Amino acid sequence: MSYERYEVERIAHAAFKSAMNRRSELCLVDKANVLEVSRFWRETVNKVAEEYPSVEYSQLYIDNAAMQIILNPSRFDVILTANLFGDILSDEASVISGSLGLLPSSSIGEKHCLFEPVHGSYPEGAGKDIANPVAMILSAAMMLEQFDMIKEAQDIYDAVDHCMEKSIMTEDLNPEVSYSCSQMGDIIESLILGEDIKLKSVKEGSASII
């Protein structure tokens, strides 16, 4: 696992800028007490942090961070870390949300960006209409934010939040009263468009009106 300085600087700047649009808190997660590459990350990020005095900057070792994200997830705003640790923490965070099917992701390059669900493809669910589409939909919202289409992105976030509040979910989150992938997509689309929706009963004895 090796990095060039410019690579760490680029992602560090992106993380600090993201923090400035949130709670202005950033935590660097590494293993600087053991790994040379983590010491390199910490040295580089410490210098970048000087350019963002308005952001509250902290550091945690990965083992402590893995514990804290379960015990007190709200303490974190933006986490900056290397790919190895990020893969671990993102899967761990899915336990808090209830499903990997809720987690979007983005890979931001200098010229190109990629937005996709954290879980990647789901070949086991092909043709079964059972996948949770929320992660993909939220990935689209992140893409809109990248294009500075903030209102459009917020409309998506609001629609998804509404579904979660009303327990309109796929089977991975609500096995007793669940909606299919296509139903979820249609509902979220209608909410974004501001349409009045009546949800048909998906299972006997269940019905919802938004």
Model feature map: region roles:
Residues F16-R23, D30, V45-P53, P73, ...:
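Structural signal for hydrophobic packing residues in well-ordered secondary-structure cores
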